[in-house]
Amino acid sequence: MRLNTLSPAAGSKSAPKRVGRGIGSGLGKTAGRGHKGQKSRSGGGVRVGFEGGQMPLKIRLPKFGFTSRRALVTAEVRLLELAKVNGDVVDLNALKDANVITRNIQFAKIVLSGTIDRPVTVKGLKVTKGARAAIEAAGGKIEE
């Protein structure tokens, strides 16, 4: 068997529809578009969300909420992800170096998800109550 001799099994691939190629094809003349109207024209069709001129649902409904700018640069870190960090000190830069969080993250919070089996020192990160208990139970400590 060679790469240049590979081919799909017989009958597994159907040929694409060839539209506008005569009456006998079943898709001749209007090519399956019907007669006249906007959708039969080249480039015909309406934009996403257009409702024929009536007030669209998106505009009929009220605006609500907002996107916190801080949330865009904040990350949650699970306990089991702390195992990827080399060394005993876990801080923002250590998490970035271990590719646990991306470079644009400015704040991180450690949450209780999974387990931690080695003592680590957490510096300058927020920690949930459950994660704090798990880190201290493993012999680690948290420094604000």
Curated annotation (Swiss-Prot):
GO terms for molecular function: rRNA binding; structural constituent of ribosome. The keyword Ribonucleoprotein applies. Gene3D superfamilies: 3.100.10.10. The keyword Lyase does not apply. GO terms for cellular component: cytosolic large ribosomal subunit. Residues 1-49 are annotated as: Disordered. Keywords: Ribonucleoprotein, Ribosomal protein, RNA-binding, rRNA-binding. Residues 21-31 have a biased composition (Gly residues). Coiled coil: none annotated. It comes from the Bacteria. GO terms for biological process: translation. It holds the Pfam family Ribosomal_L27A. Part of the 50S ribosomal subunit. Binds to the 23S rRNA. Belongs to the universal ribosomal protein uL15 family. This is Large ribosomal subunit protein uL15. The gene is rplO.
